[in-house]
Amino acid sequence: MWNSVQCAVQGRGHIKSNTPCQDKTYYLNENDTSVIALADGAGSASMSHFGAELVTQKICRLLTQQFDIYFNEEDGVAIKRVIVGTLLEGLGKLAQDLDCEVKDLASTLLVAAVKNGKYIILHIGDGVIGYVKNGELKIASHPENGEFVNTTVFVTSKDALSTMKMMKGQLNGITGFALISDGTEASLYNKREKSLAPAFKKIMDLSKIMKADCLQNEMERSFENVIKNSTTDDCSLIILVEEDYSFPGYRKLSEAQKRDFLSLSGSLCVGKRLKRYDDIIDYLENPKDLFQVSKHIHLRKKYCRKHIDYLMSKNFVIAQKGKYSTAIILDKD
């Protein structure tokens, strides 16, 4: 089973000009196929946010229906032609509905799909596609620039078909994919070294042990408070990660495994600390404030806060609206 987490936030420049967020992400899991897609609407195209939304949804539906056909077809150009043609047909109909030109719906497109140990990657335009293989973070596809400086290729561009990248193969140790827009590149992609920031690996690792809604909230907070401050552009990210069946949930971990997860070692009081952390983690299954936690574990608030801060540093606990709650998955169904 593959899971997805996604985030798209309006850039500072678009907030100032009252322009909608033009980055769109989408995830679909059907027919034993999991697909993620990201599209960055062209800043020069007035309706690009509508186009970005359409192409992400349409490509995900297309790949859940045609994955095997596309994977087994040896003529890559023929597949690309069908995909681009299908997307342009959808954009043409949308342009009629919105009473605009197809070029007004221009966007890039990044896609990763998996099914039964196989993958397909598609890329038109800028943005970056990364993946994790055997625990190592790698790049599958770098940004594709246009003919002129500071330009890129869009699904609606005349050279979309000729520049479109398509990769497919066996997963063989690949456990996650990440798609990022060019706005997010400023913080999470090193152009000189052509490498992704270690934060991606951390997000993917956390997605295997953290509750999906908690990870989603933390990603959104990070994007709002950190990522988007590095650029005026919209910022988006979507990841697809294989579930870690070796993690049964925190409550089923052995004491040694819990110590390892919490980095507890070399302390004479480690057993006592672990027991206290267990108590806090269980108690915060439902949100509580500091006073409630302090009262429950019979510890003064300033010392209680230190324990909670430590658990937050390990991403086991998160804080929202003055209350704390457990972020780590306690039990798996």
Residue ranges and their predicted role:
Residues 1-61, 127, 159-161, 231-232, ...:
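N-terminal entry segment of metal-dependent catalytic domains or homologous docking segments
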Residues 71-130, 164-171:
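Catalytic core of PPM/PP2C metal-dependent serine/threonine phosphatase domains
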Residues 163-333:
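C-terminal catalytic subdomain
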Residues 5-20, 88-100, 131-172, 207-228:
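PP2C/PPM family metal-dependent serine/threonine protein phosphatase catalytic domain
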Residues 36-40, 122-124, 178-180:
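Short hydrophobic beta-strand that contains or immediately precedes a catalytic carboxylate
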Residues 19-29, 102-116, 120, 144-189:
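Acidic loop->beta-strand submotif enriched in PP2C/PPM serine/threonine phosphatases
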Residues 58-96, 198-219:
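Helix-loop-helix
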Residues 33-35, 119-120, 129, 137-138, ...:
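Hydrophobic residues embedded in beta-strands of well-ordered beta-sheets
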